[in-house]
Every structure is written in structure tokens, then in C-alpha cells.
Amino acid sequence: MKALTPEPSSNLATEPWHLDRVHRVLGHHGNGQNGNGTRHAAVPAVLPLFKKVHTYSNADRVRATGLYPYFRTISSAQDTEVVMNGQSVLMLGSNSYLGLTNDPRIKEATIAAVEKYGSGCAGSRFLNGTLDLHIQLEAELAHLMKKEAVLLYSTGFQVNLGVVSTIAGKDDYILADKSNHASLVEGARLSLGKTDRFAHNDMDALSRRLAQLPDEAGKLIVVDGVFSMEGDIIKLPELVKLARRHNAAVMVDDAHSIGVLGQHGSGTASHFDVVDDVHLIMGTFSKSLASLGGFIAGDAQTIDFLKHNSRPLLFSASMSPANTAAVLAALHIMRTEPERIAQLWKNTSRMKHGLLSLGFDLGNSETPILPVYTRDMLKTFQFCRRLQEEGIFINPVVSPGVPPGQELLRVSLMATHTFDQIDRSLEAFQKVGKELALI
């Protein structure tokens, strides 16, 4: 694997955004003529709506440093190593926890589905977009999650947007962990319910909030199972006890728990043996299950209510045949090859021990998500760039992804990483960490 030299930022992206510069780049001249001497239309004034667009400069300021780390282009399958700019790079930023995105069995299943069903469903689940594949997948997921019923959505984001906004009405309360995923935040904003956010994974804070609410009010406690940036696990046994005491419902976002925690990778509630105490469990297919889409699992009556009232479901096209078939194949592999989850945890242990022994701060991580805290925005971008130059792809996380002062590099392990790859990445972390005085 060769070290990767990042592409230099273009001058167009790094220079200040001025009208005269736009004219210069496009061949315009101040006399109202273009480069050919013919007249052009006057540049219209900026509409009030778009003033925020023209004054936005955060991305340009980062580009100007030469450290802009977003929208990097990959020209290969998502695997333990990927190709960028024609060079191989070790991938430590993927959410493919079981390493299935490039599995030949899943690719064969998607090809077969396209050959039988075509490329899309051309409609919503509510109308003409329900395939027998969707029904089969919902049944298999209900069995895995030990719930009466499951409903598929086209993306994981849509699940949280649709479920929270539909379930929580104007007289209801939503109690949300402050570190919840953005999709849960947006679902709460879209709902008519009143939202109260409690300190991250703080059950005392949640207890105080619950005690302040009317006994007769509807209450939904919504949390991540595994928090996507911190890598810690919700204190679910304590949470469900509080929910019972205060007559509240519980919804767990298991996007980063499926394929990682619980029996056969079935998630956080299974991990803590409290499945019956969690009313709704959300999962996504874009991580361990090597596809795209999401689901909500719960009792049959609630799922039927969502089928007929959840607008992100009703007014979105259904999951494609290829995506659905990929999940079915991935579920089969996850059930029949438990050694994958075991290897994921072995890899996590090796990387975590290595990073800690080097002196890095990993916070309270308990999962294959390992946050390497820099607590500094510039150092986060510098660290990301230097690791890329050393042939390591990693994701930087700064505000608003985390609060200011909690900036980090997010390491995520895959079951298919080798110990050799992990050890090589640790060597790069040691080298760059010392350069930046982080260790």
C-alpha cells in the first residue's frame, strides 16, 4: 500500500468569493462585454433568500488551509482498502462493520434481483411499490428483532424522521439524549410534541426530566443504542426502569448496533436482554448490512399505524430490489457466520489497546467506534491530512457533529481488517500523533 498524496486544492475553491473574480474567471469585463466583445446580461442582484448562501464562508476557510477533508473521491469498492487518486489507502472510516459491502454473495444476490425485478419499484410502499422481497425482509427482521412486525423505509434517516414525527403528537413529550443522531433531532423538530434533551447518557438527568412531566402525558424516550461519535452504549437497563416508573415509551436507534451487539447481531436491547421493555427499535442497512435503507420494529398495531400515517414512508419510493436483496443476503451471512462479529470485536480490542498504549484519548468508547480526541479543530484537520499522506483514510469530526472542544478522529473497525492492517495503522498514528504533539 502506497502512501497517498492528496490532490492540491484548486485555486478556484480557495480564493475569496468576489464578484469581480467571478467575472475574471468567466471571461467577463467591467464594460458589460464578454471575452468575445459581445454584450452579456447584467449580473442580477442577490435575492434576499440567497444572501446566506453568498455570505457562507466556513468551507472556503478550511479549503484555504489546504486541509479540507470532505467529499473525497473513492474509485473502488468499500473494503478494508480503497482506491483514491489511483493509490491504495487503508480504510478506517467505513461503517461496514461486518465487511460485507464487497462480499461476492451479496453482489450476486443484487444482480439476480435486478434481473428479476428491474432497477426500481417506481412507487411508494403504500401504492405500487411493495414487492414480495419487502415482505420477506420485514418478516425476517421481525424474527431477528423478536418483535411482532417491521416496516421498511428507503433510508435510515427517513425512519427516524417518520417515526418520531408521527408517534409524538402535540400533547406528547419527547425526551432525547443530547448526543442523539441528527435524524432523531430532525424527527423531534418535525413533530408537534415538546422536546426535552437530557445530558448524554445521564440517567439521573433523565429521571429529573421525567419527574417534572404530567403523569397523564404521552412520553417517548428516544436514544441511540450505540452513539455514532462517542462509541459508547446507552445505559438501557437503567433507562427502561425509569420508563416503566413514569409510563413512558422507549425507542432505540440501533443503526450502529445491528451486526455489532446482541444475539446474532440483533442490537442493544438484545445485548442487555431487555427486548420486551423497548417499544420501538430502529435499524439501518447502510452499515453492517451492506446496503441502503432502514426499518422500525415494534408491535403490530403501532407498525400498522405508521404504515398509514408516516409521511416519509407514504410519499417516498420504496427500497430498490437490489438494496432489498442485498440486505436479505447480508442477514443470512450474519446469522450463519457468527465468527464475523467475534472477529470484529477482536479487531476492536487490538486497535483500542494499541491506541491507548500510545497515549491517545479514546473517551468512553465501548464499541468498534473509537473516537481519537484531539479537542482542537485545526489539529483534527491536520491529523486527518497527515494520516491520508501516510495511506490511512479516516473521518474527522468537528462542530456541529460534536460540541466545540470535543473534536475527534473517528476510527471504525471492520471484521475483515487484518491484524497487519491494524498494526500498520497504529504505526501511522504513532508517527503523526508525535508530530502534532498529541502523544
Where are these regions (language model features)?
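PLP-dependent enzyme catalytic core of the Aspartate aminotransferase-like
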Residues: 1-38, 43, 104, 108-112, ...
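N-terminal "arm"/small-domain region of PLP-dependent enzymes with the aminotransferase-like
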Residues: 2-39, 47-119, 248
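Conserved N-terminal alpha-helix of the aminotransferase class I/II PLP-enzyme fold
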Residues: 108, 112-156
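Active-site phosphate-binding strand-loop segment of PLP-dependent enzymes
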Residues: 196, 200-252
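Conserved PLP-binding catalytic core of the aspartate aminotransferase-like
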Residues: 342-351, 356-391, 401, 406, ...
